[in-house]
Amino acid sequence: MANQEIARRRTFAIIAHQDAGKTSLTEKLLLFGGQIQVAGAVKSNKIKKTATSDWMDIEKQRGISVTTSVMEFDYHDYKINILDTPGHQDFAEDTYRTLTAVDSVIIVVDGAKGVETQTRKLMEVCRMRNTPVIIFVNKMDREAKDPFDLLDELEEELVINVRPLTWPIESGPRFKGVYNIYEQKLNLFQPSKQVVTEKVEVDIHTEDLDNHIGTPLAEKLRSELELIDGVYPEFNVDDYLKGELAPVFFGSALNNFGVQELLDCFVEIAPSPRPVQAEEREVQPEEPKFTGFVFKITANIDPNHRSCVAFCKVCSGKFTRNTPYLHVRHNKTMRFSSPTQFMAQRKTTVDEAWAGDIIGLPDNGTFKIGDTLTEGELLHFKGLPSFSPEMFKYIENADPMKTKQLNKGIDQLMDEGVAQLFVNQFNGRKIIGTVGQLQFEVIQYRLENEYNAKCRWEPLSLYKACWIESDDPAELEAFKKRKYQYMAKDRDGRDVFLADSGYVLQMAQMDFKHIKFHFTSEF
């Protein structure tokens, strides 16, 4: 029973550059899972209904995702857990952490723009973890690059072998559909349908194909399919599972075209939950005892209640409601009477969850990102880094009557990992560090709308925040004295050096040879 439940789980993230169509694809997958009746248009000028996975007010207003949302549904005999991640580069850290909680990834690429910066960075994280990748080339109903040029670009930019499993017949206004190489079926395109398009079984070597798409396109398709067989490696599931080969699908998420082929193939070939590396040992999903780690914390999923939810990935065994589990960092036992599973902000209480599932645990400040829960074993799961921010600003209270609300808001948003908080040792002022400007706007907006607190920003020109440590306590003290005005503490009380230029950092590294300067911290 346990092994069957684990084997039917598929936990994956959808990642891409901003505007490639991740959230549209998520919506259509939910449509097939029967979770929503009509998919919301993501662009803000077409608001029939906002996207299901964009649940914060700011996401609905701007038509972008600013936080990872978790959704689960059943499809055929499989239990699917989707994590829709922000594509905007300012929220990359949320996405990096999400990749530690999934077993495979679907990368969405815009057919007209090809591989973009953010996609490249996220693929590096997938490569580091040998995560299996499927690529969906989206927006084929608009003018797109030549599909062979796209395949070359994917191989070169993402450093992975590719094999198309569906193939487009033209693009833009001439787009006729895709040929499903995997199932040897022709799928004809009908725009703006919320339902599945018609599939026709055709032998591509007969006139049947010509009757459906016309002789010129049929001839072109036959020669392209021959070229594919000659140039690209045979699709091999083992190579895909090792992260060495990426199957490629073409379609249009907004028009719900090519999505079902992607989903059907995905559930068949994608891995069930994989082993997870802890500092002490490798944890196998089939182990009878429950283990899990917190990879994300979200405040105010329900704005009527100032509640936080810790997202926990079940790594092994079975989680049961109201059972005592050990919170390893605090070394204390906790019970959870209302663990939840999600459909964006709609949540339902669950009695049990298996390896591969993502559950939400109510959090009143107990959890931090990276915390481990077990049945008693002292385990620490690895690989939840926090990167040195790129931008820094002082945060000031704009309404002295709301100091308490502001402090609570900052604490909860920092728990989420939205940004990082440092306290300057020289003047005691709070500094917020982020990856991009948009995060400052999101923090200000959420403080005002969710905590009724106002803040203002004061610019601060810094180059990097470096976590420092040394085996020589005397040298560490000497460094902290000399650089006193540049020293800060992070939320865990660790020493951070705020270098205001690359030159200052270089000189510090030369003058203090026994001090280690780190650009990432483990949470």
Predicted regions and their residues:
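Structural and coupling elements of P-loop NTPases
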Residues: M1-F523
